[in-house]
């Protein structure tokens, strides 16, 4: 292979990589992990996940799980000032024996099952109406918060 052929192949590879990255709908931070500033604390999760909005202004979770002008879906109000008391050690209203958040045990926390769309859930994966599901990075932060004791921090 000549130097010119190798140079041309490198240019084509660089352009192909650029086209793939530019055409991707997901942000690289969504693929790699949580966005900067998102921490495994309740206050960070409540503000940056539960009450966050997309580019169209739709709330990821509080579009349905709010008491503002309505009864919250599943009786679960995820506004930051009330969410903790309605999540931690609270039984699911639809799945007998399931607890929404089991401190120290993300694998047995029903909210994780619902957000990941596991086969044992009642109803649909969440969030169901507001667009994309949570990223792997966001789920990792929620799991870490639960596994470290689900503190109201």
Which positions does each model-derived feature cover?
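Residues within well-ordered alpha-helical secondary structure of globular protein domains
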Residues: 51, 117, 144-148
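Solvent-exposed helix-loop boundary motif
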Residues: 28-39, 43, 47, 54-132, ...
């Amino acid at each position: 292979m000549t130097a010119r052929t190798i140079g041309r192949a490198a240019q084509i590879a660089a352009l192909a990589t650029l086209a793939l990255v530019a055409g991707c709908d997901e942000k690289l931070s969504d693929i790699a992990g949580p966005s900067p500033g998102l921490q495994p604390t309740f206050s960070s999760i409540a503000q940056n996940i539960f009450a966050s909005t997309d580019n169209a202004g739709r709330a990821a979770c509080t579009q349905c799980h709010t008491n503002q002008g309505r009864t919250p879906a599943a009786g679960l109000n995820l506004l930051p000032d009330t969410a903790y008391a309605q999540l931690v050690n609270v039984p699911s209203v639809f799945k007998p024996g399931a607890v929404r958040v089991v401190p120290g045990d993300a694998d047995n926390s029903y909210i994780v099952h619902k957000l990941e769309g596991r086969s044992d859930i009642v109803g649909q994966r969440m969030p169901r109406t507001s667009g994309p599901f949570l990223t792997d990075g966001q789920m990792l932060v929620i799991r870490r918060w639960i596994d470290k004791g689900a503190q109201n921090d």
